[in-house]
């Protein structure tokens, strides 16, 4: 019994010597006008990555688009320890891409992750946030799309609970960013639970 007590005391003493673990503080909030340059930096990084992977890549988005999204509270950021780790935009209607879908849904666009925070499952965290946001608005689905048949991205979205609904080339692209003219659009949907 004395051995067991000494062993427990030794293990407790060792546990006390562990270095403190710093937990990251994570916050999701609306982007602000002061974030515009950082948003465009992240878009450029994401576009360069898409080019490197020979994927359909984003054009340079008009600054007015981002400013309007910020002013409409539809541009979001995930902060980790005060640094922008991920950005995205939302809308409640996406008829140009999704057609005449009548179910109330949250549409997510242009997810861009700060390379310093890659590999931390941030998309999954933002989808968890989207689920709670959608519930608070009585929405039925979270919907996303991507241009080009990116099998890795399709698999990733399926892994985090999205149903891949298929792909098709859009017939009408007026009013959409240029990359929608360059490939098939892949559609993803997840029920809000």
Model-derived features with residue positions:
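Terminal substrate-recognition subdomain of acyl/acetyltransferases
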Residues: 3-4, 8-12, 21, 170, ...
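Short, Lys/Arg-enriched N-terminal segments with co-localized hydrophobic residues
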Residues: 16-25
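A short beta-loop-alpha structural element at the N-terminal edge
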Residues: 27-41
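Acetyl-CoA-dependent GNAT
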Residues: 33, 44-116, 124-128, 191-192
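Conserved glycine-rich acetyl-CoA-binding loop
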Residues: 114-128, 137, 148-154, 159
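Conserved GNAT acetyl-CoA-binding A-motif
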Residues: 134-146
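Conserved catalytic-core motifs of GNAT/GCN5-like acyltransferases
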Residues: 143-146, 158-180
């Amino acid at each position: 019994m004395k051995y067991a007590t000494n062993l427990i005391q030794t293990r407790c003493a060792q546990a006390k010597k562990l270095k403190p673990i710093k937990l990251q503080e994570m916050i999701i909030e609306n982007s602000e006008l002061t974030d515009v340059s950082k948003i465009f930096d992240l878009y450029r990084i994401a576009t360069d990555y898409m080019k490197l992977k020979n994927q359909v890549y984003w054009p340079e988005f008009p600054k007015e688009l981002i400013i309007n999204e910020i002013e409409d509270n539809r541009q979001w950021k995930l902060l980790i320890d005060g640094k922008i780790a991920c950005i995205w935009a939302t809308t409640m209607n996406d008829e140009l891409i999704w057609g005449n879908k009548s179910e109330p849904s949250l549409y997510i666009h242009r997810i861009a992750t700060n390379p310093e925070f890659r590999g931390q499952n941030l998309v999954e965290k933002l989808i968890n946030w989207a689920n709670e946001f959608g519930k608070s608005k009585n929405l039925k689905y979270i919907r996303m799309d991507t241009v080009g048949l990116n099998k890795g991205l399709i698999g990733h979205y399926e892994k985090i609970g999205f149903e891949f609904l298929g792909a098709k080339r859009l017939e009408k692209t007026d009013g959409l960013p240029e990359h929608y003219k360059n490939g098939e659009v892949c559609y993803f949907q997840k029920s809000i639970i």
